From Swiss-Prot:
Signal peptide: none annotated. This is 1-deoxy-D-xylulose-5-phosphate synthase. GO terms for molecular function: 1-deoxy-D-xylulose-5-phosphate synthase activity; magnesium ion binding; thiamine pyrophosphate binding. Keywords: Isoprene biosynthesis, Magnesium, Metal-binding, Thiamine biosynthesis, Thiamine pyrophosphate, Transferase. It catalyses: D-glyceraldehyde 3-phosphate + pyruvate + H(+) = 1-deoxy-D-xylulose 5-phosphate + CO2. It comes from Rhodopseudomonas palustris (strain TIE-1). The lineage of its organism: Bacteria, Pseudomonadati, Pseudomonadota, Alphaproteobacteria, Hyphomicrobiales.
Length: 641
């Protein structure tokens, strides 16, 4: 610990039970110390930052008022849960966040009983919370379920589906809307806090319930008008609550999420209520309590290691452009020649490179929010009118729009262009964000063109290829992070559809790569050459349509054929095996194996370590070749020593 973050009261807290023994004035001090500890920890590890600082008081209040983990506390997405982890027995490991063997950057059921539901993706908390609340009622228990969801996450359709269901069931669910963007622009202050306490209190709820019961015995027209008048009066005084009231929630707020004098009595009132569901609208500030993060919330949403005194982040020197920037720049160049090109993102403009496109073509850029399903069908609609939509979405988030890809795009052969970022393993964000499955879930669909960029130069050409494909949907996948530092083309040149390329020619072993594992395949070929095994290295470029001619030639001309991909079982390697089987090539002498990600959800680590563990680095490729040949790589190497 540094002088900056001495935490005498926090040092006495091992579990929330310790927190609940303190006086209210001490709770305020705990919150201050918790903020200092969060700042200090993230300065060491990096990670999501601004959102966690914004919920320090809320986190402290929730654990003080509710009996966690008996009361279930669910954090939507989970990236704001670092303060929660510190208060729930994980402080001693908080400086292992997002490192191999360390704490997850999100909530995780296997990590603590205080994480009743794991997360990573958005907008799941209310559905999960409702399930827990109903389970509690069915079991005859009376514990509270609290779902904390941000104003960005609550915009997704799944959240509204859950609220609609919860309101109709009158379940004892508590939803806390963490509004840190002021998107609803509510009044915040003493009067709002007073009214929130009033409306969360027993007297108001009892009167309201009595009114509902009386309304059941009134003529329908009068009852409807009375209910409408009550909703309008609440909307006039409180602002922002009418929608949630229509969904069947008791709306409480807006409340200053940094004022414990306001938060604690409201949470206590709601805790002691006999009815539900409740929605408490809490207004917070991202980066609260740390000047640089308050001044630039976007830059401090997620950080690398940084200097606490200055806020300067220790970013490594770049040796090559990032794939997302190459995509964005390539799309701009193509759009300068074609006014039908438009860019679409689902709340990730900077993460996908669409922000680069937006600066050049703001009117042709569409950020639809956390709404991947809508993004895909919106793109499909644009395609029907002759536009060329590029839908840039992370591989892991594209999973959320699978039915739209099938039903709205592929069946109709609409030329939507998918730019699939974060393909393969993503390191510190772990299993919830890994792009492991798109090869498999897209490869089984008719009418798709599927490409993977082996390096940043290939990505430029593949963007140009997508522009030229106007009779069916297409997808190009590429990983997180920097490219290889290869020479970049001035302009993209459309590739021949369904044709791969041979990088180097050999005659004993063939390594057929799909994606950026090509670099490791080349390293493996160098090693195999020193061991006397002449090795061909090929870049498939396309998974669909597959270069059948290339695949058959590699199988005929080599004793061993390995496919290598940054994807799960059922992807590129499976397509190659299917092709070989159909041509009778697996009946002969070729020894074929598919190197894929292991059939597990891999925990977070740095990408190099993860790919080594997955058996997809050069060393593992060499070992696999010798395993197939029935030899030991270490023995063969020692013979040459």
């Amino acid at each position: 610990m540094t002088e900056f973050s001495k935490t005498p009261l926090l040092d006495t807290i091992r579990t929330p039970e310790d927190l609940r023994k303190l006086r209210i004035d001490q709770v305020r001090q705990v919150a201050d110390e918790l903020r200092l500890e969060t700042i200090d920890a993230v300065s060491v590890t990096g990670g999501h930052f601004g959102a966690g600082l914004g919920v320090v008081e809320l986190t402290t209040a929730l654990h003080y008022v509710f009996d966690t983990p008996r009361d279930r506390l669910i954090w939507d997405v989970g990236h704001q849960a670092y303060p929660h982890k510190i208060l729930t027995g994980r402080r001693d490991r908080i400086r292992t966040l997002r490192t191999g063997g360390g704490l997850s950057g999100f909530t995780k059921r296997t990590e603590s009983d205080h994480d009743p539901f794991g997360a990573g993706h958005s907008s799941t908390s209310i559905s999960a919370g409702l399930g827990m609340a109903v389970a509690s009622e069915l079991a005859g228990k009376k514990n509270n379920v609290i779902a904390v969801i941000g104003d960005g996450s609550i915009s997704a359709g799944m959240a509204y589906e859950a609220m609609n269901n919860a309101g109709a069931m009158n379940s004892r669910l508590i939803v806390i809307l963490n509004d840190n963007n002021m998107s609803i622009a509510p009044p915040v202050g003493a009067m709002s806090a007073y009214l929130s306490r009033l409306y969360s209190g027993k007297t108001y709820r009892s009167l309201r319930e009595a009114g509902k019961q009386i309304g059941k015995h009134l003529p329908k027209l009068i009852a409807d008008r009375a209910a409408r008048a009550e909703e309008y009066s609440r909307g006039f005084m409180m602002g922002g609550g009418t929608l949630f009231e229509e969904l069947g929630f008791y709306y409480v707020g807006p409340v200053d999420g940094h004022n414990l004098d306001h938060l604690l009595p409201i949470l206590q009132n709601v805790r002691d209520a006999d009815t539900g569901p409740f929605l408490i609208h809490v207004v917070t500030q991202k980066g609260k309590g740390y000047g640089p993060a308050e001044a630039a919330a976007d830059k401090y949403h997620a950080v690398v290691k940084f200097d606490i005194a200055t806020g300067a982040q220790a970013k490594a020197k770049s040796n090559a452009p990032s794939y997302q920037n190459v995509f964005g720049q390539s799309l701009v160049k193509e759009a300068q020649k074609d006014d039908k090109i438009v860019g679409i993102t689902a709340a990730m403009p900077s993460g996908t490179g669409i922000d680069i496109f937006e600066k050049a073509f703001p009117k042709r850029t569409f950020d639809v929010g956390i709404a991947e399903q809508h993004a895909v069908t919106f793109a499909a609609g644009l395609a029907t009118e002759g536009y060329k939509p590029f839908c840039a979405i992370y591989s892991t988030f594209l999973q959320r729009a699978y039915d739209q890809i099938v039903h709205d795009v592929a069946i109709q052969k609409l030329p939507v262009r998918f730019a699939i970022d974060r393909a393969g393993l993503v390191g510190a964000d772990g299993a919830t964000h890994a792009g492991s499955f798109d090869n498999a879930y897209l490869g089984c669909l008719p009418n798709m063109v599927i490409m993977a960029a082996a390096d940043e130069a290939e990505l430029v050409h593949m963007v140009a290829t997508q522009v030229a494909i106007d009779d069916r949907p297409s997808a190009v996948r590429y990983p997180r992070g920097e490219g290889r530092g290869v020479e970049m083309p001035e302009v993209g040149i459309p590739l021949e559809i369904g044709k791969g390329r041979v990088i180097r020619q050999g005659n004993k072993v063939a390594l057929l790569s799909f994606g950026t594992r090509l670099a490791e395949a080349e390293k493996a070929a160098d090693e195999l050459a020193t061991l006397g095994l002449s090795t061909t290295v090929a870049d498939a470029r396309f998974m669909k349509p597959l270069d059948v001619e290339l695949v058959l030639k590699l199988a005929r001309d080599h004793e061993v054929l390995l496919t290598i991909e940054e994807g799960s079982i059922g992807g590129f390697g499976s397509h190659v095996m299917q092709t070989l089987a159909e041509h009778g090539m697996l009946d002969g002498e070729v020894k074929m194996r598919a190197l894929v990600l292991p059939d597990v959800f891999m925990d977070h680590d740095n990408p190099v370590a993860m790919y080594a563990r997955a058996g997809l680095d050069a060393k593992a490729i060499v070992k696999k070749v010798f395993d197939v040949l029935g030899k030991d790589a270490a023995t063969e190497t020692s013979k040459l020593a």
